[in-house]
Amino acid sequence: MTLDYDIIVIGGGHAGCEAASAAARLGSRTLLLTMDMAKLAAMSCNPAVGGVAKGQIVREIDALGGQMGRITDLTTIQFRMLNRSKGAAMWSPRAQCDKTRFSEEWRRTLENTWNLYIWQDAATELLFAPAPETNAAPSDNLPDETTTSFNSAPGTISSAAESDADSDPTLRNAPSAAGKLAIRGVRTRMGVEFSCRKVILTSGTFLGGVMHCGASHAEGGRAGDAASHGITESLRAIGFETGRMKTGTPARLDARTIDFEILEPQYGDENPAKFSFSPETKPIKEQLPCFLVYTSKEVHDILRTGFDKSPLFNGTICGIGPRYCPSIEDKLRTFADKDQHQLFLEPEGSSTNEYYLNGFSSSLPWEVQWKALHKIRGFEDLHIFRPGYAIEYDYFPPTQLHHSLETKLVSGLYFAGQVNGTTGYEEAAAQGLIAGINAHRAMKGESPVVLKRDEAYIGVLIDDLVTKGVDEPYRMFTSRAEYRILLRQDNADIRLTPLGYKIGLISQKQYDHFTKKNTLVESLISFAREQSVKAAEINDYLKSVDSEPLSQGRKLYDILMRNNVTFDSLQNTLPKLRKFIAANEITPEAIEEAEIQIKYKGYIEREKFIAEKLRRLENIRIPENFDFHSMNALTIEARQKLSRIRPETIGQASRIPGVSPADVNVLLVKFGR
């Protein structure tokens, strides 16, 4: 057994599994360090993948060659395409998964990946060495000074300036906080020292994790798992800013004690789709339902009796929680006028009685949770497997990263997932994939993969983190993307599969499948452009779909731009169309893609024009280590923000909060229009 690797990934969650898989498949000798091999990519919270904007991210991961979409398809127990009633830019796939099988499939995938090795242990210390200037990869732009120190009160950001450097053993690895460092290895709890060239930190909620349930507090990364100590201290000692965040999870319920007969079922799609573009996975045939339940005034009154013992309200929890996934006690305080809240009862698998109560996350005392749950209709005889709890953990403000996800302070060290202040399996997996790709490419002296905001939701995610930072757990929404008509879930393969193939994560077989689909889409669009349709042969159809009849013949392409007119419904009316689709074996996926491109042509072209116009700013680079304080024409706030975040382009600078359009014009004058 060797103790030397190209890349070490710390943490076996969704980010770590994608990072390790990508790095190893690309050719780097990779070690995945995890505290429990039986819980790889564990679904620690809800047993689902996807959702609004998140589903688009999963399809992008798949299009680039990541694993999450494929493994989701293999373990799906219900599939729904959300927002079908809205425009195609808003369609978002979501799947309930069998959480046990999901983790098992990930383990099977990783154990069968050549060049990937797993070691069960806890990383406790990162090892550093001075970074030779010649080792700097294109993304290794290290700052001359360490980051500014912030107030280190509980729950706030702090840095090495406040730590006792003399007594901290990690400083034996670092010449000084201001020095340029490179990663050289990892030391574990068992005392094993691994050497490497790159490290990807994906430790989720485990760094300094503390769980809260009423007056009960315990260290841990999640229920049943120990917290991780040493890494945060190791990084703070050399100048990294750190902070605390909080998340939570609801009680798990025993299905045998629930009266499903009186609950409102929520079924999956009649014709379910899937996440992966690969033909090797198939849509699910037999689905399990979810159920809708509701709280009541009586439930709320019981919950309020525990507010004085809530760690969220009595000052015990200092970490910042997710705004868009609040606990039930948060909801009651924020929406005090509401007499009920909708909850979703979701199965955790096809062979378990365990159910997840989505919307009832709580850190109230367990007995308060118990009493309140029993007052929900259908839960009168309820047994719970475990109560809900909150968890606080360390994170690192992501403005300390390059867009490659490599840290600015340490060459060869990458962060991905919740350590960057994000929340959600999908956001974590996307970061892990990009970090794995870029760590490998840096090993080879190749430029990093940086997705732009008009290329992928993943690009929006990373740019938001690196440029704007976070002041609460970050989750993706379609509203965060300026170009969401370009970034649809249906065209993720068109946008990203050529890149995945060029990188080396998409196989020739997968790429051939992609090009075949693309050819079918283009051929159907061409047919629609060329095919003339007489008014007499289509007017009855148009009336049936409440569309204005034709006064003269039109091209099929123009007719398809109308609302309610679809390729599928036209096939019975236009035999030539039906024959063309059958003769060319055009798949339903290709038909849908062609139809969307036709209907949204004007919107797509407009967004492309705007994106190209703004991309000019992305091509104007700012010299690294430029002294923004020397530019008196900039506002003081802009000088401070630019000096701290150190944007690499004027485009990035323009998105920093506190940098005004006037400041951007000053930068344009300085660095060229």
Regions found by a protein language model. Name each.
Residues D36-A38, T232-W370, T467-D540, S544-Q552, ...:
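An anion/pyrophosphate-binding glycine-rich loop and adjacent beta-alpha core
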Residues Y356-T422, V450-D463, T587-K641, R646:
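A glycine-rich dinucleotide-binding beta-alpha-beta segment and adjacent secondary-structure elements
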Residues S21-E125, A129, M190, T202-R222, ...:
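Conserved N-terminal/central alpha/beta ligand/cofactor-binding core
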Residues L3-Y5, R189-K198:
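Core beta-strand elements of the Rossmann-like FAD/NAD(P) dinucleotide-binding domain
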Residues T2-A15:
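Beta1/beta-strand and adjacent pyrophosphate-binding region of the FAD-binding site
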Residues I10, E193-G204:
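Short hydrophobic core segments
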Residues L127-A131, A178-V192:
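Conserved beta-strand-loop-beta-strand element in the redox core of flavoprotein oxidoreductases
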Residues R480, L486, T497-K502, I506-N665, ...:
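Extended, charge-enriched "interface" segments that sit outside catalytic cores
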